[in-house]
Amino acid sequence: VTDLKATRFELDGAVATIWLHRPHRHNAWTGRMHTELRWILAELEADPAVRVVVVTGTPPAFSVGGDSQALAGHVERGSYDTGVPVDARTPGYGLDARLDAELSALWGLRFPVIAAVNGACAGVALALACFCDLRFAAAGAKLTTAAPKLGLPAEYGLSWILPRLVGPTHAADLLLSGRVVTAAEAPYGLFNAVLPDPEALIAHVQDYARALASTVGPAAVAATKRQLVADLLRHDPAASVRESLRRMDAAMGTAEYAEGVAALRERRPPRF
């Protein structure tokens, strides 16, 4: 990717913000957008200065999901094509083979990814938000799984992730009906917080992201994210305890831990 046409991104210190950026189509999802998103994430993953990534949409939408022109093309072909080239970047791949597929690979990234759902969010865009580590939304943002009203099954792992966020009963409602709900009406567990409007949302998310980037150790965040993912994929509490003890033992020999303890004892903010 040498010329971003469907996305854009900016760096502000240790926080990167990515916009899904096709405002003339309400940021409708295309293979080009997906490819660009993967390229940006791969570039950010390679930059050790980046500690937090925010994903949002160019107003007024987050993303209305699959572009209708692309959907019509699937009808003509009679099959599905993601539109992503086979040699596209694969950020987040390699941590665990069970994550190495499109959006679930977000969990393999070293930094937290925060979804700021500022407006309409449908289909694959909802899946993108769900696979982010944290999710915040504007109260009036409209959400839908969309697929059943197109005659399609659940897409991009929504049948796996939604029950884990909101429970099987609420997930079944959203996945089977495809009905539209606002973020304010969404089942508990989908969002970390719902803000009154898009402006308040972006301000809140940027404050949260800056705090996350500056007040906690980046190695600790990366390790904790890996613990969360590992424990979600297994049913073995004893293994989780053993893994946490191993990670704590390793962390206590690092400069990051020494700084954290020094800051605590000196009653000052840590300088990570």
Regions found by a protein language model. Give the residues of each.
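C-terminal long alpha-helix characteristic of the crotonase
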Residues: P23, F136-A141, F191-R242, A255, ...
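CoA-thioester-processing core
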Residues: E102-G108, A116, A122-L175, H204-Y208
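Conserved CoA-thioester-binding segment of acyl-CoA-metabolizing enzymes
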Residues: V1-T58
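Acidic, divalent-metal-coordinating active-site segment for phosphoryl/phosphodiester hydrolysis
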Residues: G178-A184
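A general structural signal for well-ordered alpha-helical segments in protein cores
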Residues: S68, L99, S159, P168-A171, ...
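Glycine- (often His-adjacent) and acidic-residue-rich active-site loop
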Residues: G57-E102, L150, H235
